[in-house]
Regions:
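P-loop NTPase catalytic core of nucleic-acid-dependent motor ATPases
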Residues: 1-67
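AAA+/SF3 P-loop NTPase mechanochemical coupling elements
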Residues: 62-67, 101-119
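Short glycine-/polar-rich loops that comprise or flank the Walker A/P-loop
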Residues: 68-70, 112-115, 130-136
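Conserved AAA+/SF3 P-loop NTPase catalytic/coupling segment centered on the Walker-B
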Residues: 69-92, 126-131
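Conserved catalytic/switch belt of AAA+ P-loop NTPases
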Residues: 85-108
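A short helix-turn-beta junction within AAA+ P-loop NTPase domains corresponding to the substrate/partner-engaging
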Residues: 126-145
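Long, low-complexity, charged/polar intrinsically disordered regions in eukaryotic proteins
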Residues: 148-185
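DNA transaction DNA-binding modules
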Residues: 170-241
Length: 241
């Protein structure tokens, strides 16, 4: 919430720091109020600046919404394909936008306003492990109380006061590392990872040096393919993730 408020207040215009972290509310059970809770974060006067419509297949439209909305809900985040993650990562990091409006010949520089939040009905939802620090996965154990009214004025007044008093609105390196460790519970396991575990293990000091193999990535792949051809069918050693 501090990051969201700082983004709205444009408190970091000079250091190119954007709110690049999105909480993800995760539960395999439906009806716990995930999407409702996301909507409730916005006060009534800002409801029109909330959206659950975010199409990553249209990069220009997705970028424009960073300047048009205050909170973007990546609803059903687990349905986003791995091929969309690089674009989403870039959009989440964007601090300044160059957008060409309709009927205009040149682009205009617009401030980034939007922050992200998301929901998922699956726990194996993260496919980009190098970028997992950008997502703060929260596993829900019970329904969210969406009936008690949110005191938006008090909430945002407190956030504003803390920010103007110098409160940090981003995670440092140590905190990012903790987030990545926590997110290991939410990684999507791909078939070749399972095959690798079946075929190999890392050597230890107790192993006989004569039995320890030094293999290249290609050699590892060929052995995995030979051991489990049906699982590895259609895969190559250089497949782009």
């Amino acid at each position: 919430m501090l990051g969201l408020s700082a983004q709205w207040m444009q408190l970091n215009p000079d250091n190119n720091r954007a709110n690049s972290v999105a909480p993800l509310l995760v539960s395999s059970r439906q009806g716990l109020g995930k999407s409702t809770f996301c909507r409730l974060l916005m006060p009534d006067t800002l409801k029109s600046y909330y959206t659950e419509s975010y199409d990553l297949s249209s990069p220009a439209s997705a970028e424009a919404k960073l300047a048009a909305y205050g909170l973007i809900n990546l609803d059903e985040f687990d349905k986003l394909g791995a091929s969309k993650m690089p674009l989403l990562k870039n959009l989440m990091q964007a601090s300044a936008l160059n957008i060409r409006k309709a009927y205009k010949h040149s682009a205009s520089s617009l401030p980034r306003i939007a922050s992200f939040i998301g929901t998922s009905n699956r726990e194996d939802l993260l496919v980009d492990r190098t970028g997992s620090r950008r997502f703060l996965c929260v596993s829900l154990k019970h329904a969210i109380d969406c009936t008690t009214s949110v005191e938006h004025k008090q909430l945002y007044a407190q956030l504003k006061t803390e920010l103007l008093s110098g409160e940090r609105s981003w995670f440092n390196k140590e905190e990012e590392q903790t987030i990545q460790q926590h997110n290991a519970l939410f990684y999507k396991h791909v078939p070749e990872e399972e095959v690798f575990r079946l075929c190999f293990r890392f050597a230890t000091e107790e192993d006989n040096p004569q039995e320890v193999l030094s293999l290249s990535a290609t050699q590892l792949f060929e052995r995995m393919k030979a051991a489990h051809p049906s699982i590895m069918r259609g895969m190559t050693a250089y497949r782009d993730r």
